[in-house]
Every structure is written in structure tokens, then in C-alpha cells.
Amino acid sequence: MSLRRCIAFIVCVVCAASFNACQEQSWESAMAAGQAAVQQGNYVEAERIYLAAVKKAEEFGREDPRVAVSLSHLAQVYAGQGKHVEAEPVYLQALKIYQAVHGENHPDVAATLNNLGVLHRMYGQYEQAEPLLTRALAIKEKLLGPHHVDVALGLANLAQLKVSQGQPEKAEPLYRRALAIREESLGPSHPEVAKTLEHLANVLRKLGRQDEALTLDLQAREIRAKRS
């Protein structure tokens, strides 16, 4: 290779790297702006920003992980606005990319399955929700172990589905596992512990165990009182 060609090649490589860095910065800025809009409760603006972020991410390739990240955030914004019809295919598109990039057993796959399951549960589509939430929980347990705080979230979501299905007896052991994990991982005075106690109390009331439910409600109130 001649000196001139060598210099030209180096210049091309440097320019490409600079261009990619600018693309990356542009995408990251869009994602940050979208998150800020969500935190402000401006879902219409967040939707617009995340749609633009998807297009920016696609410049890296249609199956680039950044596309899946952008799609996941967009789907969450759709869901936050009650746009189930719009959210589901976007989640599915993100899931397809995550599975292609990472395989079946990956935290991003589990998170997307979980979000899809919660979406279906919210709209009363319990038969579709259950296998998604069950699969998400299984992946988390395999990757993180049975006592990780993210496993508690999966257990709680599955328990909530069982309550919605009119099966409080199946929800109780799931909530108890979630409670034990959260108490151990987050401490006995954490707000998530209080929330789990309240959900478990609700289940016990449905099972006719009023005294036990009252005890848990009082524990939850004590936690919230200490933090107020």
C-alpha cells in the first residue's frame, strides 16, 4: 500500500469513528430527553422523542441493541398512556431484537417478557399474560438466583396476576416469597416491603383471614409512618 493510500485509509477510519461517536451522542441525548419528559409526566413529548430515538438507533443497524432499548422505552410510554394496541407490537419488536442479539436467557429478554405480561394483565388478557410472566421469572431465577430483588418483582407480578384471575390461594405463596426477598435485600423498613405487606394483606382478606391481614396492614403502616 502506497503512503498516499495509507494516509487516505487512516483518514477514512478516523472520520468513520468520529461519525459513529456523533451518532452515539445524538442517540444518548435523545434517550435522556425522553426520560426527562417521562419524569415530568409529559408522555406526548416523550413519545415524540422516543420515536426519533428509534430512527437514530436504526442508523447503527435495524437489529442493533440500541434499537431495542429505544423501542422498549417507546412501548412503556405507549402503555403509560393506555395505548395497549400500540405498545404490544413495539414490545414484541424489541423482544425479537433482544433474543437475536443476546439469546433466550438474558436480563433484557426477561424485562421485556415481564413488561409484555404486565401489559396483558392490565387489559384483562390473563391467558396471554401468564406464560410471559412465568418465563420472565424463570429467566431471572436462572441468571440471578432465587433470592435476588429482581426475582421478587417477578414473583409479585405473577402474584398480582393470580389475584386478578380470582386465585388468591396461589397468590399467597408468591407474595410471601417476594416479601422474604425484599426484607432480606432491602431491609425490613423499605417502602417495597410495606407495599408487599399490603398486597399480601389484601390476599389474606380474600381468603377470609381477617386477623392476619390486619396484622400485616399495621406493619405496613408502621413502616410508612417511620419514613414520613
Show where each model-derived region lies.
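TPR/TPR-like (Sel1-like) alpha-helical repeat modules
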Residues: 176, 198, 202-226
